[in-house]
């Protein structure tokens, strides 16, 4: 939820922020990076849903939940770092 919120705010900022007369979001490298981050968030969300399904079905899910926990921490740091970069001086 936190990574998704950060990314949504950054996308809105990139739409509003103009660089050399064009929105920051018009830059292809920005689009690719934001798409990659959104893809990773969605992949982690699906892994979490998979863990919940396993837990509800009373299946062993220790390995999957450990993977999700590790990936979540890394992804939040990665998204926060990229969002900070896109916000530039306003990120602080």
Identify the residue ranges that each predicted region occupies:
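Alpha-helical interface subdomain recognition
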Residues: 1-92
């Amino acid at each position: 939820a936190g990574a998704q919120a950060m990314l949504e705010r950054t996308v809105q900022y990139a739409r509003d922020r103009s660089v050399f007369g064009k929105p920051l979001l018009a830059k292809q490298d920005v689009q690719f990076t934001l798409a990659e981050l959104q893809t990773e968030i969605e992949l982690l969300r699906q892994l979490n849903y998979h863990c919940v399904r396993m837990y509800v079905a009373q299946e062993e899910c220790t390995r999957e939940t450990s993977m999700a926990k590790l990936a979540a921490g890394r992804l939040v740091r990665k998204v926060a770092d990229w969002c900070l970069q896109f916000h530039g001086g306003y990120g602080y």
